[in-house]
């Protein structure tokens, strides 16, 4: 029969120990009352069985501080500190507690001593930690770069439905003894007494590296036997595919740590395997594979953001502290990186303006306040997926100095840059290509994971990191990309694709069809708008040559309302159309079918088959457009149309509603008069000698210049 797990219990059978039970198995935990500072030295014989590393054995028995070459550790001034009565009582109690443990000892002055100030920090459990302010002394300590595990190391190890546990070492730093000859550097004064640390203090710069290095052989020996474990200073995360695997890891780790002299904190450890574990302020869930902030941590961050949001002129330090909280929450807040960089950039700018003075005041922009509001509204519900799902859509993009291109499945698109855009850095253009690709090919995609493949490493980095700090311009575009995706509840990821494998998107960014890009001069368009507008949609346009904000493109386009004008109804909005000449006949059919009304720009070619139909659909006299070199130009190069001298364009207000056509024709019959020549009344489309008059179904059509 399966024995239910129980919590840590105190037993009378084993003196000064607790017993941890799990499914009929157990192991002892040494009582925390047994703790004495520097106790690792009493277990040096066990450390020697584990490692022969001289540096580690020295640290275990009498750790020596590593000084910079040539450092003298001279102290010029000893600052006098003042504390209020409440602070004094807290410090008195903490000093007494530390003296009882042997962490502090009373001493006398000696040559070469270094006396530092002290301060306290409130801990989560409401007690206080005494900290030696070694900022000045640390300038003499040798710095070594080292790798320390983080919460991300833990998250990377989590697998679906795995079991997890954690072990917390009690007073971990205080377990490591400081060599007697180096204790004189760790002194402070209190109420006429001179006190010094006998072990690692909180605040010594080399301690995190030394403690991490000290535990390396410990965890290496456990990993060699198959235990999955991640240490972080005094905390250890343990994992197993089954409850028993995880339990055995807990048992082996706890017993080994105790054999080496460490005391395990039973209240802060989680010995019994579980699938939802709180570790380092994060809630790790292997069932749904997510990470969340603990409620306390989320509330603290929300309160900090609210306070900053309400501050009129916060100090730069206030802003920096909130940014620190935001960044530390990143493993559990999916969109963290998207909503902190504006604040970070403004902090950097403010520091430059104030010559590095963190106590100077700054003003937050509307954008920064908007980001803060996002945190206030969302941080308590935020989570982050440990393993994003496989992509549903894969899209390749590319950019050149000429234009952009994109490919999704068998659909391709691309376009030229405007002259101003072409001047931008290629990294900006590559990111803009991604934005245009999403707008063009994924506008209607919802609830999907979209993978972007790019041969530009900056693009990959800025998408995966939701922005970056090196380029403000790239960061702005990256934020637009993500906001576009989030509005559609899509998730983005990016991967690098070698340029040799990105040929289709590359081609789209360099090869263009300019025959569809001719644009009517904006002054002429404005005159037409005043005459017959305003127009609500441009039916044949692109991002660069659109005359109206709402437009339809002939291929996927980042700003288009729709693709292919013939795929939508034209009857709802007064339209402006400047179609390719080969599509004029089809446009007239569409206008009739949809009973639409609008302006169409066409060449005055009476010999074309569509011409009689066009004239019969008029509801206002056509306007001839001036034959000028700049009438038609390509927007990206301002090149003029090669036929501008020979081609006469006209603007026609047409309708697909027969009653409106007949009403216009009737008015012309009533108002027409002779211009000195006779036209055959039966002619369907005859042109007068003046070149500006036509007869359509017996009605004289007189053209005038715009």
Please name every model-derived segment.
Residues 55, 208-252, 256-257, 266, ...:
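Active-site palm subdomain of RNA-directed nucleic acid polymerases
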Residues 138-144, 175-177, 224-260, 282-293, ...:
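Catalytic palm subdomain of template-directed nucleic-acid polymerases
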Residues 98, 162, 173, 194-227, ...:
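Conserved pre-motif C helix in the palm subdomain of viral-like polymerases
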Residues 438-503, 507:
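RNase H catalytic domain
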């Amino acid at each position: 029969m399966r024995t239910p797990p129980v919590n840590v219990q105190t037993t009378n059978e084993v003196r000064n120990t607790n017993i941890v039970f799990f499914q009929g198995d157990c192991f002892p935990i040494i009582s925390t009352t047994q703790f004495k500072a520097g106790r690792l030295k009493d277990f040096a014989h066990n450390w020697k069985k584990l490692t022969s590393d001289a540096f580690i054995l020295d640290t275990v028995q009498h750790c020596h501080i590593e000084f910079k070459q040539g450092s003298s550790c001279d102290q010029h001034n000893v600052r006098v500190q003042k504390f209020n009565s409440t602070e004094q009582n807290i410090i008195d109690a903490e000093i007494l507690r530390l003296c009882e443990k042997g962490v502090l000892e009373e001493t006398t002055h000696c040559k070469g001593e270094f006396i530092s100030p002290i301060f306290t920090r409130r801990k989560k459990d409401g007690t206080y930690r005494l900290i030696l302010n070694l900022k000045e002394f640390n300038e003499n300590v040798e710095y070594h770069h080292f790798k320390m595990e983080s919460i991300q190391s833990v998250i990377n190890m989590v697998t679906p439905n795995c079991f997890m546990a954690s072990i917390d070492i009690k007073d971990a730093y205080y377990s490591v003894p400081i060599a007697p000859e180096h204790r004189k550097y760790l002194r402070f004064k209190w109420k006429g007494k001179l006190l010094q640390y006998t072990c690692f203090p909180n605040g010594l710069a080399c301690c995190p590296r030394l403690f991490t290095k000290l535990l390396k052989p410990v965890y290496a020996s456990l990993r060699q036997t198959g235990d999955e474990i991640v240490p972080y200073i005094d905390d250890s995360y343990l994992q197993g595919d089954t409850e028993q695997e995880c339990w055995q890891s807990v048992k082996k780790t706890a017993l080994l740590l105790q054999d080496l002299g460490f005391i395990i904190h039973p209240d802060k450890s989680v010995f019994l395997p579980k699938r939802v574990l709180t570790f380092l302020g994060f809630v790790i869930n292997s069932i749904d594979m997510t990470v969340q902030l603990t409620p306390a941590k989320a509330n603290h961050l929300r309160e900090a953001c609210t306070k900053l949001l309400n501050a009129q002129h916060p100090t730069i330090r206030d802003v920096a502290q909130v940014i620190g909280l935001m960044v530390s929450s990143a493993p559990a807040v999916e969109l963290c990186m998207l909503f902190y960089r504006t604040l970070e950039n403004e902090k950097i700018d403010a520091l430059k303006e104030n010559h590095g003075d963190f106590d100077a005041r700054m003003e937050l922009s509307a954008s920064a306040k908007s980001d803060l509001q996002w945190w206030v509204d969302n941080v308590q519900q935020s989570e982050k997926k440990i393993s994003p799902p496989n992509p549903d859509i894969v899209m390749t993009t590319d950019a050149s100095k000429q234009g952009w291109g994109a490919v999704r499945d068998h659909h391709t698109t691309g376009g030229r840059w405007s002259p101003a855009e072409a001047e931008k850095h290629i990294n900006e253009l590559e990111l803009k290509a991604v934005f245009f690709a999403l707008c063009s090919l994924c506008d209607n995609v919802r609830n999907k994971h979209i993978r972007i493949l790019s041969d530009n490493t900056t693009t990959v980095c800025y998408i995966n990191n939701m922005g970056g700090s090196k380029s403000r311009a790239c960061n702005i575009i990256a934020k637009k990309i993500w906001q576009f995706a989030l509005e559609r509840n899509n998730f983005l990821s990016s991967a690098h694709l070698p340029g040799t494998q990105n040929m289709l998107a590359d081609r789209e960014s360099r090869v263009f069809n300019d025959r569809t890009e001719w644009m009517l001069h904006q002054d002429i368009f404005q005159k037409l708008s005043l005459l017959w507008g305003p127009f609500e949609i441009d039916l044949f346009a692109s991002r660069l040559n659109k005359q109206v904000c709402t437009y339809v493109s002939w291929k996927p386009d980042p700003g288009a309302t729709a693709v292919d004008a013939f795929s939508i109804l034209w009857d709802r909005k007064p339209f402006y159309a400047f179609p390719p000449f080969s599509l004029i006949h089809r446009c007239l059919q569409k206008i009739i079918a949809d009973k639409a009304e609008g302006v169409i720009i066409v060449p005055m070619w009476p010999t074309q088959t569509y011409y009689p139909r066009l004239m019969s659909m008029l509801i206002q006299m056509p306007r001839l457009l001036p034959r000028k070199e700049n009438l038609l130009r390509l927007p990206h190069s301002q090149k003029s149309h090669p036929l501008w001298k020979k081609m006469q364009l006209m603007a026609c207000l047409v309708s697909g509603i027969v009653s409106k056509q007949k009403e216009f024709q009737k008015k012309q019959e009533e108002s027409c008069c002779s211009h000195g020549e006779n036209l055959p009344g039966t002619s369907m489309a005859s042109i007068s000698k003046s070149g500006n008059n036509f007869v359509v179904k017996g009605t004289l059509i007189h053209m005038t210049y715009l």
